[in-house]
Structure formats: C-alpha cells, structure tokens
C-alpha cells in the first residue's frame, strides 16, 4: 500500500480544508495518509513516505508564510530521490503573485531529486466544488505516477 504525507500551512483555514480534501481523496484510493501542520513537522519526515505533498498559502507580496520558512529551507537539503511530490494551495487572484508559494515549494522539491507527480493546483480563496474535483484528480495523478514507477 502506498503512503502519503500531507504537510500544510494555513492562516484562514482554506489550506487546512484543502489538506482535508486531499486526505479524504487519498483514503478513498486506499493510500495510507498522514497529515500535519508545517510548524509541527520536520522536512525529514518526507523520507518515510512514498508521496509527499505541501499545501500552502502565499503571504503578502508573494512571500512564504512565516511558519513555513524553516521547513522550506530544510526541505531543499533533503534527499528525496525516488519520491513523488505534489504541491497545492490557496491564494487570491487579486494579487499579482497568485499562490506563488505553491510554485516556490515545487521548485524546492525539485532540488531534492523527487519527481513531480502532478501539476500544481492553485485555488482562489476557499475550495469550491470544481476545486474539490481538481484536488481529487490531483491525488489520483500522484498515485498513478507513484504506481508507474513501482
């Protein structure tokens, strides 16, 4: 059975909701899933899972959330060769740097040797029905990428 680790940063609750939607999607795919908040998680924990996911918001003018900075820096030092990763998160399309932290984390994962299992998912504010469908498809694609490599 495949395993997945979802680490999230959430200020308004939108990204925690995204993490919960992904958790349910993976459970429905018979994936053993663990979810934790970013400030309570060490980046090295990703080594223990097959599929590694970050869910984050973007703060201010395209900045990482304060509580995610240490994790972000530590992540880039990890060796996650052979692992599958995916990034998702919320933002506000009002801003020029819409959900930029999602892309920043995807770039950080690429430095670890992990394989991007699905394109990033960016959600405008809170997830709505079409976003839930996109997140379910995201989870399926991550699992399909994992299965194709194992």
Question: Language-model features: where?
Answer:
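Local sequence-structure signature of Cys/Sec-based thiol-disulfide redox active-site neighborhoods
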Residues: 4, 8
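FMN-binding flavodoxin-like domain, especially the glycine-rich phosphate-binding loop
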Residues: 3, 14-17, 25, 29, ...
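Short, catalytically relevant binding-site loops at active-site mouths
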Residues: 41-42, 60
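A short beta-strand-loop structural module common to alpha/beta enzyme folds
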Residues: 31-41
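Short polar catalytic/cofactor-binding loops
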Residues: 9-13
């Amino acid at each position: 059975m495949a395993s997945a680790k979802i680490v999230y940063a959430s200020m308004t609750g939108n990204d925690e909701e995204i993490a919960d939607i992904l958790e349910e999607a993976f459970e429905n795919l018979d994936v053993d899933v663990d979810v934790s908040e970013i400030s309570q998680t060490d980046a090295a924990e990703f080594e223990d899972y097959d599929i590694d996911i970050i869910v984050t918001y973007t703060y201010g003018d395209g900045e990482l959330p304060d509580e995610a900075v240490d994790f972000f820096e530590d992540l880039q030092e990890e060796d996650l060769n052979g692992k599958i990763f995916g990034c998702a998160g919320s933002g506000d399309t009002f801003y020029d740097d819409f959900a930029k932290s999602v892309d920043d984390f995807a770039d950080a994962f690429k430095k670890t040797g992990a394989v991007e299992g699905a394109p990033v998912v960016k959600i405008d504010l809170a997830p709505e029905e079409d976003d839930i469908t996109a997140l379910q498809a995201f989870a399926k694609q991550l699992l399909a990428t994992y299965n194709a490599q194992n």
